[in-house]
């Protein structure tokens, strides 16, 4: 990886030819348009000028709301170059959450790419048109001023990324540029991602995994591909690397539409069947999986997928230990803190360890993540870790998402309920019948519900707290008595 002394896009622009010809570096493929690093850097400078004219400074905190697009990517880079702390937001985040959250994060400006209004205290920004990658966008004197503005500082705060909020209101995790780049270094070493490769921006920028793709691209001078409105097989054209969930890879293989250029995938979001990775590897696609979290700027541990439940070993720059069954992490990818009320709140103990609240163990040469310490509940004296039930559910080929939460029960204290998102090819009854023999009696859900649209928040992870509240509101009160069905 390069040693950066300037903004990454400027660094790579200084290293590569201005025009794009066969076999020369391409920075960005947006649909079918190819951008050189020079053209990309000029477009970023143009947007920096546009945003600074609207009052964005190095002291600003800017919320950036929208789905993945070339406009979203350029805005992200330009706001970083302005020196602002950039907070990418899920466009499906409820208004009530946004209105409660943004004032506490001292958000000064907001750029919305989906026309939703901002709370009154947030000054809305407009976006200049993204020009085609040719010609000069700024006069020479303005371009020179852009270059003379804020200088690259790797240890400066760059981004605020919301946690999933799975147990309540999301927290804003603050990362420096250096932390993002260190996170990228571990993954690109593992997956042999280099300047001659390309990665599809398949995950949202409001999630740390989506930003991880961007920083791997910036760290290596490779190509990023943005095709947000195309089917997956079309979007993957020209891509050597991709971040996928198992159901996406299954479809590419089963429909025989796996792109020829694809050579490595980072899998997440569900259990990964060995049969899937064996098929992919037979087609020349290496499969990787692991364990990541927002506070560690994405991936903390990883390995070549092998059908076993472990998550491998810590990547370069990360350390891991186990204390009272809890996973603790530290390293160069760790966030600077949680951002609230205009300041950083520490997230580590006196020795620099972050307490994840994840249960874990080390066995057979790798780490295993057993679930959240605060998710466990008891039913008739038996401890239930909902992630264990979810893991079995997610091995069903037609289960796309699953969340298991407790409901109160007079006799047993609590019982599990499953909320699942299914493909149209199966039913809740069929999934229940399939699951029953695979679980102990106390683990079997007493009810199954289809995941409602309002809980599909567009993120990588469902909010367990929201699912729990929704189930509590609809679960029959009679089922909380001794006559509860399904026992």
Model-flagged regions — what are they?
Residues 241-244, 252-308, 319:
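Gly/Ser/Thr-rich phosphate-binding loop
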Residues 310-314, 323-351, 372, 382-384:
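Conserved ATP/PPi-binding loop(s) of AMP-dependent carboxylate-activating enzymes
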Residues 5-6, 140-162, 169, 178, ...:
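Conserved pre-ATP/AMP-binding loop-to-beta segment of ANL
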Residues 377, 403-409, 417-421, 431-487:
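Conserved C-terminal "lid"/linker of ANL adenylate-forming enzymes
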Residues 331, 359-443:
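AMP-binding/adenylate-forming catalytic core of the ANL superfamily
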Residues 103-114, 158, 171-255, 264, ...:
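AMP-binding/adenylate-forming
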Residues 49-93, 383:
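Conserved AMP-binding/adenylate-forming
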Residues 1-54, 433, 477-487:
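N-lobe entry segment of adenylate-forming
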């Amino acid at each position: 990886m390069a040693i950066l002394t300037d903004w990454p896009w400027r660094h790579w622009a200084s290293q590569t030819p201005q025009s794009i010809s066969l076999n020369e570096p391409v920075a960005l493929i947006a649909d079918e348009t190819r951008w050189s690093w020079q053209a990309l850097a000029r477009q970023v400078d143009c947007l920096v000028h546009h945003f600074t004219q609207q009052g964005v400074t190095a002291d600003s905190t800017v919320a950036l709301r929208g789905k993945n697009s070339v406009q979203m990517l350029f805005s992200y880079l330009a706001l970083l170059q302005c020196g602002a702390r950039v907070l990418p937001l899920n466009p499906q985040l409820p208004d009530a959450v946004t209105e409660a959250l943004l004032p506490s994060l001292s958000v000064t400006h907001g750029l919305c790419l989906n026309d939703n209004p901002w709370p009154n205290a947030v000054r809305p920004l407009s976006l200049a048109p993204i020009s085609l990658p040719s010609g000069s966008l700024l006069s020479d004197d303005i371009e020179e001023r852009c270059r003379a503005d804020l200088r690259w500082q790797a240890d400066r705060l760059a981004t605020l990324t919301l946690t999933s909020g799975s147990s309540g209101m999301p927290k804003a995790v603050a990362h420096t540029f250096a932390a993002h780049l260190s996170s990228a270094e571990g993954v690109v070493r593992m997956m042999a991602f280099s300047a001659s490769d390309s990665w599809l921006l398949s995950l949202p920028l409001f999630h740390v995994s989506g930003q991880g793709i961007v920083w791997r691209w910036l760290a290596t001078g490779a190509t990023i591909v943005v095709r947000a409105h195309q089917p997956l097989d079309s979007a993957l054209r020209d891509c050597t690397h991709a971040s996928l969930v198992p159901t996406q890879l299954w479809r590419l293989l089963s429909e025989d539409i796996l792109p020829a250029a694809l050579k490595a995938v980072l899998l997440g979001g569900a259990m990964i069947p060995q049969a899937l990775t064996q098929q992919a590897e037979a087609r020349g696609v290496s499969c990787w999986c692991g364990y990541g979290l927002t506070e560690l700027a994405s991936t903390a541990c990883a390995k070549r997928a092998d059908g076993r439940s472990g998550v491998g070993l810590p990547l370069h720059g990360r350390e891991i230990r186990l204390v009272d069954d809890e996973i603790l992490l530290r390293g160069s990818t760790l966030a600077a803190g949680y951002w609230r009320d205009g300041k950083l709140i520490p997230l580590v103990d006196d020795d620099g360890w972050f307490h994840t609240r994840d249960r874990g163990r080390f066995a057979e040469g790798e780490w295993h993540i057993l679930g959240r310490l605060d998710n466990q509940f008891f039913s008739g004296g038996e401890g239930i870790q909902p992630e264990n039930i979810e893991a079995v559910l997610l091995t069903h080929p037609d289960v796309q998402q699953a969340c298991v939460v407790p409901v109160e029960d007079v006799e047993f204290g609590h019982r599990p309920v499953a909320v699942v998102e299914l493909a149209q090819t199966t039913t809740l009854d069929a999934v229940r019948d399939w699951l029953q023999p695979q679980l102990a009696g106390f683990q079997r859900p007493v009810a199954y519900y289809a995941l409602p649209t309002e809980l599909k928040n567009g993120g990588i992870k469902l909010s367990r707290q929201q699912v729990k509240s929704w189930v509590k509101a609809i679960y029959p009160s009679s089922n909380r008595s001794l006559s509860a069905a399904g026992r």
